[in-house]
């Protein structure tokens, strides 16, 4: 027992020796509060060497050591000295600590250089809002906007550590402040912005910029790139090459995306010259905290190029005449074929409406299809597909036999007791003979008919390899008791027949009975009524687009593009729900134009006034097709400042709606008539003062079918000083015209009209027609009623036929079975129904006469009758309108030349009118035409694709017989930069 007490005493001596005692800090306590700029002294006493540390920092300034005691002295304390100070016994690592507060009356929270807090999702985030006074109470975390904290956010407040947010989530991101109460006063820290970086939840996704299989020829270069992203930078990306392949160079790149600090990595494997042994699987591996992802590419290296064909159809095909047949060939090739063609019996085939050739390629597969539309007998034969890529070639042949119906081509008899029947068809017709007692009846369909098989001689007269086989059959007549003999030719289940009368018999019948006569008469009357109704229906005018786009010229004949065949780009589609309709701008027999507000047309927050074309609810399918054709033509033409441009369309989920620019001043004709009283005339050759022009009653009324003006017309005399100043600023470029007052500058209804305005209208219409001509487009109804005006008195050419009732419009005269604007038509259009670019030039001359007569009707006082037509043929032309300068009348006369070839093209007209414009007007037009047009969202890119159109010289064309404008699939949208104006 005494032995145990001795062991216990010894162990206690070793356990509680003086060197293991904990250091002591003076002053005592858990914390010390020091005033701002006051001295601070801390002493640490221990058995051995002591050292001061501050929050794990190994060194602290101001420390002195003497005989196992370490003193820390700070002469002027400030908030930067706040924190936990640790006294460490260097040998035993025993420690004691104390927290120092430095009271700052102006800053209840220590100022921090850190305002942006970055944390990983799932980690804890520390907001370093340290209190300078331990008496601060109710330390809380709030958002800077005083909104409620995010759902699920938990935090721990501490005067020494600030606020610790636990398990941070992406939804916690935002601005936070620390608040508390100090001496009955609410205090708050400065703002802290918390950013939470997400952590991956799955292995990375690899995007490969290469097909699953890559084929190369020896010594070609190999580039394989794989990409991946990760929410942080802890990701690895590498390539693994197959065994036996040559060393490959791998280039890597890394960048941080602005979205959520996502890091994007890419790795590119490069072999400058591949070898056969490089064939194999190349694997890209990406690794993050959640695992590894792989994507692989198989590389095949060949000595030279190859081609392997795989015909979809059998080599020999039979098809009925009139049916269509699709021949398909699929090729695996590398490189892709340089040449591929179809031929028929050794003659090359081209893409036509009867032979439609379609080619497709994907990676290393090339396919070609030949569609034979409604095969004819003459199209039976051998079709061959050939392709080559320089290293290899393929040749595949299809043998096509066209099955035709049987046809009795000749028959004779009975002659000398024998009848003869000749039939043709493919395959060779099978001829059979039948006897029956019924006269003039098909014996083969009778129950008691007899088939003749013994006395029949059948021979083949003609049997080409491809085409109809001609077969002759003869039969000896030996059965006098039968009255009818039938020859039946059969091919593939189809029959043709002819009947022979064996003996002449008088058969009584009541062919012309009263009942039969009455039935035939009623049928004839009914047919006559149907013919009349059909004629009346065909005479009824139908809606069609006036603008015609030329595809080619054959001699002096035009070939127009079928607008139904033009493509419709669905990027022009606009949601119906974003349209709010207003008043009707114009209404006609077929449809109407309605003012509407489009929301989100240019951008998501935009609101734009537009004009919407639509058909009436009673529209027929042909009229719906015509409106769709007009939409496709507008897409094809593209944008120009002097035509009414397309903005969008609604073709899905309801009736077709065509959305175009809204022209606030209506049509030019009514605008000119409305401005007559305030017109200011000045001519180059004489002085002319302000005039009031009395409205002629027959011209003063607004057109019944015109485009409604959406701004109030000026009343009284608008020649006030303010109008003069506005006009002067518009013409001379004074500082009155500001970008911020653009709407005020364009309030043109309050301004008068002068000769410079008329020249501007003439110039703008000529520019628009020059653009349409460059697109090989003929207008066919160019007149002031089809010119609209918008802000800034910008003239825009349109086709307003949809909203005009030509049956009630006196400008359209009945000629044949159509209503035509005869007074605007050229002689060749009136007498020969020929519409050309030059006929549009003639109509433009009439339009000039309308402009400089301020809206008078052409050929005033002359009805359209036989005398009118005679005068036009004899060369009668109108005199100069009252307000036309001499040069403008000379342009009119040149437009009215009897020889279409002598009429100036619109390019020359533009040059001549531009010489008469003032520099101010030119400058204004250049400003307008150089502006970027308002394009709907998503159309800018699509509008960059254009079809290269080359204008034709229409009249008296001496070119080769055919000059196609559109080659098969080369129909695209009009390109960008339609608003650049070249100055002459």
Swiss-Prot record:
Sorted UniProt keywords: ATP-binding, Cell membrane, Disulfide bond, Glycoprotein, Immunoglobulin domain, Kinase, Magnesium, Membrane, Metal-binding, Nucleotide-binding, Phosphoprotein, Receptor, Repeat, Signal, Transferase, Transmembrane, Transmembrane helix, Tyrosine-protein kinase, Ubl conjugation
Catalytic activity: L-tyrosyl-[protein] + ATP = O-phospho-L-tyrosyl-[protein] + ADP + H(+)
Segments of skewed composition (Low complexity): 711-723
Cysteine pairs bridged by disulfides in the record: 44-87, 129-178, 144-175, 226-284, 421-487
Segments of this protein annotated with the region Disordered: 711-749, 936-963
Annotated signal sequence range: 1-21
Keyword RNA-binding applies: no
Glycosylated position list: 227, 260, 314, 351, 395, 448, 476
Name of one Pfam family that matches: Ig_PDGFR_d4
Post-translational modification: Ubiquitinated. Rapidly ubiquitinated after autophosphorylation induced by kitlg/scf binding, leading to internalization and degradation. Autophosphorylated on tyrosine residues. Phosphorylated tyrosine residues are important for interaction with specific binding partners.
Modified residues (Phosphotyrosine): 558, 560, 690, 707, 812, 925
Enzyme class: transferase
Topological domains annotated Cytoplasmic: 536-984
Extracellular side: 22-514
GO BP field: B cell differentiation; Fc receptor signaling pathway; hematopoietic progenitor cell differentiation; Kit signaling pathway; positive regulation of cell migration; positive regulation of receptor signaling pathway via JAK-STAT
InterPro entries for the chain: Ig-like_dom, Ig-like_dom_sf, Ig-like_fold, Ig_I-set, Ig_sub, Ig_sub2, Kinase-like_dom_sf, Prot_kinase_dom
Domain Ig-like C2-type stretches: 23-97, 98-197, 203-300, 311-395, 398-498
Bias kind Polar residues: ranges: 944-960
Function: Tyrosine-protein kinase that acts as a cell-surface receptor for the cytokine kitlg/scf and plays an essential role in the regulation of cell survival and proliferation, hematopoiesis, stem cell maintenance, gametogenesis, mast cell development, migration and function, and in melanogenesis.
Protein name per the record: Mast/stem cell growth factor receptor Kit
